[in-house]
């Protein structure tokens, strides 16, 4: 058993998920102090406690110690076990908050993961399940994580503040990951989207589609935005509507943007026309930033490159988000790995923002739980 002396120490509540996920994969214990120590309501929030409970479910033999006020957390990771399970997520954050971390851990379980998550499927803070399905799953497939049992499905939609959504996620396990070379994003060839509405008029979704198309039609003809109006028990507990858009390039890169309406009873009411137009503009901004991986999945791509075989992996990204920059620092702490970062200024033929080429040699991470057959 690793003693607390070998553990990594951090302070503050920021990047809690990053630290716990990397701790689980590297096997290094982590101690986090001063979690909102000066706050009027100190310690871990409900959604963070729920995340720790989820980690406890998917691992076997984890040791978690939290002090009385919840301001200090000691986490000694166990083995990633997987299997079939259910988890009730906190409605304070979206299911995407939990799913992002499961996408990092799922390929390295002992048994294939099959999990039902309940809570908020679409909110204004976390990536929605629709966007993760359209962007993160194709990215995992590039690394060789694929198969019939690789699935992410929205069974019920749930909007904040009530939630009531349900998502099914299953992922096969892999012993090793393939190195990747994603250096040419290609040109945008089609845009797909999903306009959803729950517990409001189904006409809302159609109005969102019309306003989004009014902007996007100027650039490309191949646009199709589905409308999804769930009824009855499948519509969750709160009213709301929103839009997620995904642009696909000729080389199989996916760039996404999304917007959701204000939660019931919070903020001003939002017109579906405004939401559609703003979401279309966000997608154009994401396309301008560009790269082979969109800004939501930058850290997932870098993690899978780190854990790949001992071979060179390269990926071209748009400007790094602050979350990704901190993730690179954590990768250095937990895995002693550093990336070669080259800036690629936008040339004449490459319209859009400046790009960053990230290169690393994988650590040859092997799923020890997975026996060779």
Curated annotation (Swiss-Prot):
Its main location: nucleus. GO terms for molecular function: RNA endonuclease activity. The keyword Nucleus applies. Keywords: Nucleus, Ribosome biogenesis. Disulfide bonds: none annotated. Signal peptide: none annotated. This is RNA 3'-terminal phosphate cyclase-like protein. The gene is RCL1.
């Amino acid at each position: 058993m690793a003693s607390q002396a070998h553990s990594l120490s951090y302070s503050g509540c920021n990047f809690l998920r990053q630290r716990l996920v990397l701790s689980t994969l590297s096997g290094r214990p982590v101690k986090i102090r001063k979690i909102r120590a000066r706050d009027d309501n100190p310690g871990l929030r409900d959604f963070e406690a729920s995340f720790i409970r989820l980690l406890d479910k998917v691992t076997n033999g984890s040791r978690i110690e939290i002090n009385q006020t919840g301001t200090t957390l000691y986490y000694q990771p166990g083995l990633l076990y997987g299997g079939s399970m259910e988890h009730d997520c906190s409605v304070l954050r979206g299911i995407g908050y939990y799913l992002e971390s499961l996408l990092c851990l799922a390929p390295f379980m002992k048994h294939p993961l099959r999990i039902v998550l309940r809570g908020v499927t679409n909110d204004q803070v976390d990536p929605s399940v629709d966007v993760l399905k359209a962007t993160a799953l194709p990215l995992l497939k590039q690394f060789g994580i694929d198969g019939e049992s690789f699935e992410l499905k929205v069974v019920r939609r749930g909007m904040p503040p009530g939630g009531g959504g349900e998502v099914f996620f299953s992922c096969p396990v892999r012993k090793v990951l393939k190195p990747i070379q994603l250096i040419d994003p290609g040109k945008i060839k089609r845009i797909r989207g999903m306009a959803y509405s729950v517990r409001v008029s189904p006409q809302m979704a159609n109005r969102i589609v019309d306003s989004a198309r009014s902007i996007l039609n100027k650039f490309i003809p191949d646009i199709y935005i589905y409308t999804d109006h769930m009824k009855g028990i499948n519509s969750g507990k709160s009213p709301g509507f929103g839009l997620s858009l995904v642009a696909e390039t000729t080389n199989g890169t996916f760039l996404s943007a999304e917007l959701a309406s204000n939660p019931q009873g919070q903020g001003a009411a939002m017109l579906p026309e405004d939401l559609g137009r703003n979401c279309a503009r966000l997608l154009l901004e994401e396309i301008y930033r560009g790269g082979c991986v969109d800004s939501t999945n930058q850290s997932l791509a870098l993690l899978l490159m780190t854990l790949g075989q001992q071979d060179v992996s390269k990926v071209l990204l748009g400007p790094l988000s602050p979350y990704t920059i901190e993730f690179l620092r954590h990768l250095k702490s937990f895995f002693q790995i550093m990336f070669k970062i080259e800036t690629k200024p936008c040339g004449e033929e490459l319209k859009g923002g400046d790009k960053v080429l990230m290169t690393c040699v994988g650590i040859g991470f092997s799923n020890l739980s997975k026996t060779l057959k």
